[in-house]
């Protein structure tokens, strides 16, 4: 039986090479189709450096002269946190006519305009002197310590407090220091 069918001139190695070439062409077209399906875009990265926040002390806190009534168990004096502070004593204390220096502590905060910041005060301030230590519970003229605003890049605030005086507080000058911190929110 003759299976030649007139195709005796076929070179089988050439067909194999053509199949390989055809396969590689399809693979290359597949990659090029993927490259046409891709897209890209660029983005811009930015950073803004703002003015550092800072605080400066303008005035120290001073409760002025206070007298302890000898027949009462001591008491408290509250100093309002304002530019013109008011002192309010409880029954056990009196405020003499010679007031001495009376002022709330004053601070100026500077930083980036329209920024919001936090003021941190201590829970208690200790005053030491010739007798037992006295404690001040501080208060601030800024109603919300966690969201004060630097409207124009500067803000002044005041710190007052409530001073607790013992019944037998020894006469003399008492003093203490306290820290005030500010940070951007």
Task: Indicate where each model-derived feature is located.
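N-terminal small/polar-rich segments of proteins
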Residues: 38-119, 147-185
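Sec/Tat signal peptide C-region and signal peptidase I cleavage site
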Residues: 16-17, 31-37
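Short acidic, flexible loop segments centered on an aromatic residue
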Residues: 119-126
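Short beta-strand and strand-turn-strand segments in soluble, beta-rich domains
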Residues: 131-142
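Cell-envelope/extracellular anchoring and linker segments
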Residues: 125, 134-136, 161
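Short, Lys/Arg-enriched N-terminal segments with co-localized hydrophobic residues
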Residues: 1-17
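Short helix-onset patch at the extreme N-terminus, typifying the N->h transition
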Residues: 7, 24-25, 42-45
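Sec-dependent N-terminal signal peptides
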Residues: 21-31
